[in-house]
Curated annotation (Swiss-Prot):
Name of the protein in its database record: Glycerol-3-phosphate acyltransferase
Record localization: Cell inner membrane
Keywords of the record: Acyltransferase, Cell inner membrane, Cell membrane, Lipid biosynthesis, Lipid metabolism, Membrane, Phospholipid biosynthesis, Phospholipid metabolism, Transferase
InterPro entries cross-referenced by the UniProt entry: GPAT/DHAPAT, GPAT/DHAPAT_C, GPAT/DHAPAT_LPLAT, GPAT_PlsB, Plipid/glycerol_acylTrfase
Single GO MF descriptor: glycerol-3-phosphate O-acyltransferase activity
Lineage: Bacteria, Pseudomonadati, Pseudomonadota, Gammaproteobacteria, Enterobacterales
Topology term for the membrane: Peripheral membrane protein
Amino acid sequence: MSGWRKIYYKLLNLPLKLLVKSKVIPADPVTELGLDPSRPILYVLPYNSKADLLTLRAQCQAQDLPDPLIPLEIDGVQLPSHVFIDNGPRVFRYYAPKQESVKIFHDYLDLHRNNPELDIQMLPVSVMFGRSPGREGHGTPHLRVLNGVQKFFAVLWLGRDSFVRFSTTVSLRRMASEHGTDKTIAHKLARVARMHFSRQRLAAVGPSLPARQDLFKKLLTSKAIEKAVADEARTKKISHEKAQQNAITLMEEIAADFSYEAVRLSDRVLSWTWNRLYQGINVHNAERVRQLAQDGHEIVYVPCHRSHMDYLLLSYVLYHQGLVPPHIAAGINLNFWPAGPIFRRLGAFFIRRTFKGNKLYSTVFREYLGELFTRGYSVEYFVEGGRSRTGRLLEPKTGTLSMTIQAMLRGGSRPITLVPIYIGYEHVMEVGTYAKELRGATKEKESLLQMLRGLRKLRNLGQGYVNFGEPIPLTTYLNTNVPQWRDAIDPIEAQRPSWLTPAVNDLAGKIMVRINNAAAANAMNLCSTALLASRQRSLTREQLLEQLDCYLQLMRNVPYAKDVTVPDKTPEELLNHALNMNKFEVEKDNIGDIIILPREQAVLMTYYRNNIQHLLILPSLIASMVMYQRRITRAELLRQISMIYPMLKAELFLHYSKEQLPQTLDTLIDELARQQLICDKGSELVLNPARIRPLQLLAAGVRETLQRYAITLSLLSANPSINRGALEKESRIMAQRLSVLHGINAPEFFDKAVFSTLVGTLREEGYISDSGDAIQEHTLEVYNMLSALMTPEVKLTIESVSMPAETNNLLPEPEAEDKEEN
């Protein structure tokens, strides 16, 4: 580089250092993209901009990547280490220099032809200042590139809202080997790079925003809404104009009013807020979504719902991943001042709890959702319908998902892909309210006062987690499961083909399974799991560390799913972090520390334990069977677990099929034996007395679930003809009784949704006949197996209420030896 050029770059860099504070995407490009800083890198930028180049250089220096200003010298040939695909517009348009990108690509390909060992990494990089999509009909398109003067003002006003996006590298060695090294390949490289950057920019900025009233006018002209308006006028005996005004009023209630300026402002506020409330936001597998957006997919985000914070957190994360924040389906209960108008400007559109009895509303909402898809906006909705009060996933609500498939049946060209997302926290601000609601308190209506009270409590929230699960392309799903689905395409009328409901229910189940497949274990949910497993909710520091190590080894050595994230910290580091959250007490004596979960915190901590219960449920079940039965063959253990696995699968959205179960159990048994929690004697699995404590704590993870199953099965065995409603009600009553008598501090233990799922599974598995009567022989078999995994006291409480004398005669005699329950 010449001396004058160095001086020029230094002078230009001075204002950039003051004005530009760019984010890098992904956060760790070397690791996430597999870059090798020791190998030559050719940086590829979309168009000639020295501001972009110097912004890139600053990030390369921060990431320990080669300097894009220093030329590469290979085999005595010196070539620039960066290339601009296009020159971009000029201030003085009569001067248009020749494009050099094709020549530079050709020179690099020539080097690879002459040197078989050479392999240069071609690294596409885009630098963006601001991301305003613009309004429809307002002048220049949002994908335009800027000349020097425009770039100056962009840096001046938007330097703090800029990002540097690194993409996956392309091997020039592979290009040379597979496609050759002539000039046509160089032209092709430049053309493909140009398309890549154009798509990437569209994914970051999104389509132009419509004027709200123009959108309403367009919706009013849709055939479906015209028909619904006519029906409204006829059924309510009002004028057509009045019915049309009713439709517009509903559009005003529903529609978002997205504003880029509001997003920019909220990003600053949220960045400040997260940095003070959270110790970190952990994001995993975001590259999947970036790639989908770049490939032109219509993305529907379907996260689990833990907290009102979810709305803000996910939009914040997506914005920082270089993606457009989605339009979010929010409950109408959040449409209060000032939250409603703010959420609306950030992309929220509001949805009522039920559409029943209001055809005009359902039609307007369906058409609005379809219009969002048609225009290419990403959408987010919570498939659970509401926030989970227990920390587990709720049964999915399928209304909006059904409308998503109906939108495909309008004949839209863009492929729709569902992206399940796991959102987790070490502290959920509403968890105290959830516990009260589960105990019967009336849900408090959302309001400004409630919001201010909630904000007052926000402090020391630990870590947050956003894990993107495995996407579900709807076209692929329908092609596989409903090959004839295209026969139902109708651009005018909303279609409800016979296959729609079964397909939607199956899809909803797959979404929940994939959310759980992306769960995040953390210090809080691991420590809560261990302490709640102890009868006195307390463990010595050594015992707690031993149990944390047991959980971590299980999760690392036998991963539940490839997308599950497990902390890379030691048990000591996790415990120290959890103690800093001020949820636990530490009592010191002459021997050492005792970690105590206070009684008032115990109920709240079940929420965090339940976040990851599905990750440990099968090892807990194996541990329980070995602990209570002392010795058991692998075949018998598989037989017993196979009997209750369908109930666990339905309740916890487990991903293992019945066919995968034997191999999964064998792998888990081998790991438990490796940890010496059990002894594998070849023909039998035997209790290891030396490791009874961690085995008991592990087994306790399934204890309450098995007791709940035993309650329902004992009632069914005693009264096979009991109807579903009575069975669920009596099961809840008995569960409440059991929780009082035996100190079970878990509100979900008698949650009606859990019993409803259980009874539905029993029917599907054939324990309840088509006539509605239980098959006593089968229910008793499972109950007897479950009762062998409970203490005599718990078993006696259940049977004293549910079992008449004649049924008790069918039960096995209790063992003489009592086994302590922890």
